[in-house]
């Protein structure tokens, strides 16, 4: 809807323009400075400027519009077009009544059944007859097992047998089945039973015993020296002994190794003996068997008076 807005002068007006005929877009206010004259006149970003001081903006370029605004010294009259504001409203049916959701807060009673009475029930054609609907039954009649293995009667018998082992004196009250000695079964079992064999002696102990017994009778057996068998070292042990040892820490080196004068070191142990400076990619010096950097090597090898130290690097 077009409306007229008057801004009292002088400049600045407090808004920014965009568009123009050179951009093939209408002149639109894109920014309002808070607290400015444009903000006091209720100008908003997005307002389309139709006229400036009575001159239409249909044929104005962006530069022409800026010149018209700069030419206004006492007041600035703008004719703007502002889009209508639409408020959201809920969708209503044709009869004018909305259909709310139906919510039932009333609790629905459920049938109570003890655990095990009807859970995971499945037809079992080869199961022994059992009262499945009995509410006192907790364990199912079969779990993919032989017929009646986990039935109620077998479980009770197993539990009773465990309790008999825990209660003292219960074995005395149990009746013992008596087998007549003159029966054929009793005689067959006892005839086929072998006599207990003598304990066997190990081969190594037998060899030691023969060595002890071969000596003279007057010499005590405890004084004879017996050598233990020597275990042969496998080929893998020799390869382990060939592992290089670090000249500084003394431990074996696995992986990267640094060699200097036929001595091996870990990369982290290849340091100066005084300042612990890592000598990798640097010059190193051996002084009295120790490894030093150039600075501390010079300090330890001071020449006599009248002589100067000259560092000689090996040729590549």
From Swiss-Prot:
BP term (GO), one: actin filament organization
Residue span(s) of domain PDZ: 1-84
Keyword annotations of the record: Cytoplasm, LIM domain, Metal-binding, Methylation, Phosphoprotein, Zinc
Record has Cell wall biogenesis/degradation as a keyword: no
Lineage: superkingdom: Eukaryota
Modified residues (Omega-N-methylarginine): 164
Domain LIM zinc-binding: start-end pairs: 244-303
Annotated PROSITE patterns: LIM_DOMAIN_1, LIM_DOMAIN_2, PDZ
InterPro entries: PDLI1-4/Zasp-like_mid, PDZ, PDZ-LIM_domain, PDZ_sf, Zasp-like_motif, Znf_LIM
Gene Ontology molecular function terms on file: cytoskeletal protein binding; metal ion binding; structural constituent of muscle
Subcellular location: Cytoplasm, Myofibril, Sarcomere, Z line
Pfam families named among the record's database cross-references: DUF4749, LIM, PDZ
CDD domains: LIM_ALP, PDZ_PDLIM-like
GO cellular component, one term: cytosol
Residue(s) carrying Phosphoserine: 18, 93
PANTHER family: PDZ AND LIM DOMAIN PROTEIN 3, PDZ AND LIM DOMAIN PROTEIN ZASP
Function: May play a role in the organization of actin filament arrays within muscle cells.
The protein's assembly and partners: Interacts with ACTN2. Forms a heterodimer with PDLIM4 (via LIM domain).
Listed name of the protein: PDZ and LIM domain protein 3
Lineage, broadest ranks: Eukaryota, Metazoa, Chordata, Craniata, Vertebrata
């Amino acid at each position: 809807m077009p409306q007229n807005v008057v801004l009292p002068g002088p400049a600045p007006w407090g808004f920014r323009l965009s568009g123009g005929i050179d951009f093939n877009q209408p002149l639109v206010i894109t920014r309002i400075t808070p607290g400015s004259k444009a903000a006091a006149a209720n100008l908003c970003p997005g307002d389309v400027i139709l006229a400036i001081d009575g001159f239409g903006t249909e044929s104005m370029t962006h530069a022409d519009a800026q010149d018209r605004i700069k030419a206004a010294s006492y007041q600035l009259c703008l004719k703007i077009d502002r889009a209508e504001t639409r408020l959201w409203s809920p969708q209503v049916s044709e009869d004018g009544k909305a259909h709310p959701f139906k919510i039932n807060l009333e609790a629905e009673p459920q049938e109570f059944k003890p655990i095990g009475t009807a859970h995971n029930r499945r037809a079992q054609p080869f199961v022994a007859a059992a009262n499945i609907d009995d509410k006192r039954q907790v364990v199912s009649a079969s779990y993919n097992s032989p017929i009646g293995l986990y039935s109620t009667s077998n479980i009770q018998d197993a539990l009773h047998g465990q309790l008999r082992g825990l209660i003292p004196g219960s074995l005395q009250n149990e009746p013992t089945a008596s087998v007549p000695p003159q029966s054929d079964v009793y005689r067959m079992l006892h005839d086929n039973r072998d006599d207990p064999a003598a304990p066997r002696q190990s081969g190594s102990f037998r060899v030691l015993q023969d060595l002890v017994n071969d000596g003279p009778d007057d010499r005590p057996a405890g004084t004879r020296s017996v050598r233990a068998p020597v275990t042969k070292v496998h080929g893998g042990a020799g390869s382990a002994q060939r592992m290089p040892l670090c000249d500084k820490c003394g431990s074996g080196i696995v992986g990267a190794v640094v060699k200097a004068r036929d001595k091996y070191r870990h990369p982290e142990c290849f340091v100066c003996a005084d300042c612990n400076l890592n000598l990798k990619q640097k010059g190193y010096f051996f002084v009295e068997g120790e490894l030093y950097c150039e600075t501390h090597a010079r300090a330890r090898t001071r020449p006599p008076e009248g002589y100067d130290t000259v560092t000689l690097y090996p040729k590549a």
